[in-house]
Amino acid sequence: MSLSLEHGHGVETPEVYPSPAAILTAALAASLITVAWRVLTFSGFNNDHYIYLAGAQAMLLGEWPVRDFVDPGWPLMYTVSAAARAMFGRALGVELMVVSSAFAIGAAFTFATASRLSKSLVIATIVTLFEIAMSPRSFGYPKIALYAVAAWMFVVWADHLTTRRIVMLAAFTVVAFLFRHDHGLYIGAGSLALVVLASWQDGLKVLVLRIGVFVGALAVLLMPWALYVQHYVGLVGYFQPGLEFSRAEAEGTVLRALPRFGFGGPLFGQANLEVWLFYVFETIPFACLVTLWFRLWRGQHRWSAESAAVTAVSVMAIAMNLGFLRTPLAARLPDAVVPAAVLGSWLLGLAWRRRGSRARLAWAVSAFVLASSAWAIVVVADVRNELNTAGILNRPGAMKERIADLRVRLSKPMPERDHLPSRNSQALMPFYAYVDRCSAPTDRLVMTGLSPDVFVLANRGFAGGQMAFRPSFYTSPTDQQRALTRLRAQSVPFVIVALEEEADFLRAMPAIASYVDTHYDKLALVPVPDTRGLQLYVERGRHPAGVDGATGWPCFVAR
């Protein structure tokens, strides 16, 4: 079965596929453009990205997710960063290499898939540039790379779905699951849809057999992870706090109602353009399904591998939109760009190839949606400012200066100036230097609230197996006792309490708070702009080897 459309009534021009060489060349070019864009527009990793770097740092200290520290479901996120740091060191450029490479993979596969579906290099170029320009947040790289590869697998494999390919779909679903569990759910939904729809015309026996292969392969491939989790905390003990954490995180960002266009401000202002993109992203997969059904009903199309692939990507898109499209939309929309780009390319290809009485209408509608979406992306993603940052629209010589500045910054392990991830880190810079001088590399820190950047920039592991001590994050009596057991077995000279969140910490984790009160003394108060500051504590009874000359604080290593 060939991956092509069947035509009727003379409404479309004959299909001409771009050559494989042209697709490969353009896909490689897209990946290089992506790397250049991500590097030139780099403005530091935000605080959320440091969650995964803190986990990676823990792994380099010999700890493993679940066994030694709590993990809500991101083991491969830590592992990829840990592997890169183990091979190439702690420089910021190492993590940027990981991120840029993943986004480059996403762009290349998006281009390859879009060119296959649209039969047009021009359309594939447009949607891929849209994806690049949206500049998803750095820690969201799996949302681009994984879904682009999945879409490509659906489209290319649909016409010949062998047992080996079904097993590979299951394996890829497991990989996605281990990056973040919901990725496995969304990609798994699309994969199962592909298996069903690509086997639909091969008879019930073949259909049931292929579903069995997919589900069986999933079970077998997930078994080692499931046994590992069951051995250390139990599957119920693993999923229950993880789901509570995810539910609490989603509670503050879930869309309570469909976003509305506002007419009290600029009609084409950012708020309205965010709403426009939201409805474009939500509408595209349903538009694809309706278009497929209508073409089948009109006899313009028969069920083919392309039908199965487009439907599978649509199922994946609908599922991921439910999970990804939350508030704030400006930050969340880029996460869902891949299926929108791929499916949008298919719709554009149909419109641009159309001939006959309704061709002008199809062209006009597609041109309007394309132009409106392009402008929305420019505004929502602040593309003009990003171009200035990169030195592309700046004064002559700005790009050269930008490259020279990045070369210095990215060679260091510590971010500087405007690349610092948080006010806490900026305030704690002298403390980081003190920790480096006066504690051992194997010592740990406790930090209340969620400030994973503190552990990475201090180059010290988090204590108690928790990078955050905050409400809804592993706060049950069992979780607190497990954290205390780990704390007692570790060397933890310092505790940092974020006073702005102190009341929440005391209420949510009384056992941990009591332990800190019993075993630690106040050391210093670090002022943080617009907050109550950070209270530093030092372990009571720990014998110093001397006094730090710069701070007057106890030093616990001989110098």
How would you describe each model-predicted region?
Residues 185, 319, 325-368, 384-389:
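Hydrophobic/aromatic-rich transmembrane helices and adjacent perimembrane loops
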Residues 150-168, 201-202, 279-307, 346-349:
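Membrane-interface transmembrane helices that cradle and orient dolichyl/undecaprenyl
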Residues 41-55, 66-81, 90, 233, ...:
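Extracytoplasmic catalytic/substrate-binding loops of multi-pass membrane glycan-assembly enzymes
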Residues 73, 182-185, 229-232, 366-556:
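Extracytoplasmic
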Residues 131-133, 166-181, 187-192, 219-220, ...:
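Membrane-interface alpha helices of multi-pass inner-membrane proteins
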Residues 97-118, 149, 153:
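Transmembrane-helix motifs of polytopic, lipid-linked glycan transferases
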